[in-house]
């Protein structure tokens, strides 16, 4: 959501302007290239045309930022980091390296298939995820650990899929959600390494809304599909995991491209099962207020966090 703190009308034109930020790689990226930025060039341009001296505040699940048009700066309000921004024609050549590792990944090792990084409970990232799990996810349990999954291969596939869907559908934004998936702790290593496997989905719980990978809006619901275990979380490229006494459960918090949903049926193998055209991107239980989502292409999923709780 964008908030315009100053409003003043300016003359508009038909010039196809776009907005760019200077990335850590030293190249200019269009705002749409970063999935974490909750605003598009078009939205920013509309506010700029109203007042070129305005200050915009914006927030999403994982990002709180501010754009100062006078200073031409983009500020991350959580970390205080600033990036230069500029306004230019949309014909400008764009840098394509946006799918490199996100800047907040720590101790990133590109030689490893993935890393499972425990978050400090005092970090803003931990507190954001913890609050989302309990408030939006309705999980009334004691969270023992939150681990960030750092898998560059899966991240690149997700970014490419997002650009492909937007290009095919002729849209500038596609609906993304943070959704939960419950599973056994023995599956953590496989999912972190290879992503969720549609071929293995529904083996134990059926295919009520389609033969795909199931996600829940609420962590409490996803937790019902996670078995209690005495096993510790696997360690791969991260710090040594604490061994918690007693049985624990795990759930994944994933970034999911749900796009345009359609009501699912048990025999569906893709959202538009009986239509040769792909008009929808996911299946749901109830289109108006979905709580269950079914994804048929793993590239529409990036597993972001593993959450362990008792």
Predicted feature descriptions by range:
Residues 6-7, 25, 32-35, 70-71, ...:
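Short coil/turn segments at secondary-structure boundaries
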Residues 100-210:
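Internal glycine-rich, Lys/Arg-flanked active-site/core loops of soluble domains
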Residues 20, 75, 86, 147, ...:
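Residues in well-ordered beta-strands of folded domains
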Residues 3-7, 40-44, 50-54, 58-62, ...:
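Eukaryotic intrinsically disordered and solvent-exposed regulatory patches
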Residues 1-121, 125-128, 137-140:
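Eukaryote-biased intrinsically disordered, low-complexity acidic regions enriched in Ser/Thr/Pro
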Residues 24-27, 61-63, 73-74, 79-81, ...:
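Conserved beta-strand elements of beta-rich interaction domains across eukaryotes
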Residues 167-171, 177, 185-310:
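Segments that shape or occlude catalytic/ligand-binding pockets
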Residues 14-18, 51-55, 64-66, 71-73, ...:
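Beta-strand-rich binding-surface signature
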């Amino acid at each position: 959501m964008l908030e315009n703190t100053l409003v003043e009308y300016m003359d508009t034109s038909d010039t196809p302007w776009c907005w760019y930020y200077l990335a850590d790689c030293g190249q200019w990226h269009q705002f749409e290239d970063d999935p974490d930025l909750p605003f598009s060039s078009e939205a920013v341009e509309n506010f700029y045309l109203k007042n070129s001296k305005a200050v915009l505040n914006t927030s999403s699940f994982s990002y709180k930022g501010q754009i100062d048009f006078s200073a031409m700066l983009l500020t991350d309000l959580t970390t205080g980091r600033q990036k230069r921004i500029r306004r230019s024609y949309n014909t400008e050549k764009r840098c394509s390296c946006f799918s490199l590792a996100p800047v907040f990944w720590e101790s990133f090792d590109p030689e490893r298939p993935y890393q499972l990084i425990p978050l400090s409970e005092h970090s803003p990232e931990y507190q954001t995820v913890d609050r989302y799990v309990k408030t939006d996810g309705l999980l009334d349990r004691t969270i023992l650990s939150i681990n960030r999954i750092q898998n560059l291969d899966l991240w690149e596939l997700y970014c490419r899929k997002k650009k492909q869907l937007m290009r095919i559908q002729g849209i500038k934004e596609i609906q993304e959600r943070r959704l939960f998936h419950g599973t056994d702790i023995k599956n953590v290593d496989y999912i972190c390494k290879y992503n969720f496997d549609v071929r293995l989905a529904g083996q134990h719980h059926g295919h009520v809304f389609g033969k795909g990978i199931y996600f829940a809006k609420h962590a409490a619901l996803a937790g019902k599909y996670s078995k209690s275990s005495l096993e510790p979380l696997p360690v791969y490229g991260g710090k040594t995991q604490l061994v918690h006494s007693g049985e624990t459960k795990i759930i994944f918090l994933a970034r999911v491209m749900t796009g345009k949903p359609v009501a699912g049926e048990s025999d569906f193998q893709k959202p538009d099962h009986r239509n040769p055209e792909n008009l929808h991107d996911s299946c749901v239980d109830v289109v108006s207020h979905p709580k269950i989502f079914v994804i048929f292409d793993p590239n529409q999923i990036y597993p972001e966090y593993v959450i362990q709780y008792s």
